[in-house]
């Protein structure tokens, strides 16, 4: 019994040591720009950009094959941060090809839903709830607006709608000083 425990411990220790040496010996250094781009991307690996996950999109952006506006869930803020890293001319806060848009979420018309589970399988954040051959619905707080479910729906029961304003998603405008308010009134 003790021999078995000692042999298993020695085997585990030896293989662990071998894996540690192999990891250091065969380590491949990735370019720093690739790690920086991947750090800015949301990391949901939804595939809405057409690349296999956020790492694939980061590789394409670092090579110049993908635009900074390719990440739909990231939106304008991610595109601006990526434009600064990839050195795209942002034009004073404007990203080429990206319009100012409000965040959207998926909405399922329940009378058209057949319960085929295709949207359920495509959602990267598990925002769609429902069972097989039952009506599905979307949890708006979990939806990132990648629109992967819209493409997967065979009955076109899913549409993108503007994210409803709730206490969690609604923000006040930035307060203005008295001088800024006065300048706005004079200009009008």
UniProtKB/Swiss-Prot annotation:
It is found in: Cellular chromatophore membrane. [4Fe-4S] cluster 2 binds at residues 113, 116, 119, 153. [4Fe-4S] cluster 1 binds at residues 46, 49, 54, 71. Residues 29-88 form the 4Fe-4S domain. PROSITE patterns: 4FE4S (PS51656), 4FE4S_FER_1 (PS00198), 4FE4S_FER_2 (PS51379). GO terms for molecular function: 4 iron, 4 sulfur cluster binding; electron transfer activity; metal ion binding. Belongs to the 4Fe4S bacterial-type ferredoxin family. RnfB subfamily. This is Ion-translocating oxidoreductase complex subunit B. It comes from Cereibacter sphaeroides (strain ATCC 17029 / ATH 2.4.9) (Rhodobacter sphaeroides). The lineage of its organism: Bacteria, Pseudomonadati, Pseudomonadota, Alphaproteobacteria, Rhodobacterales.
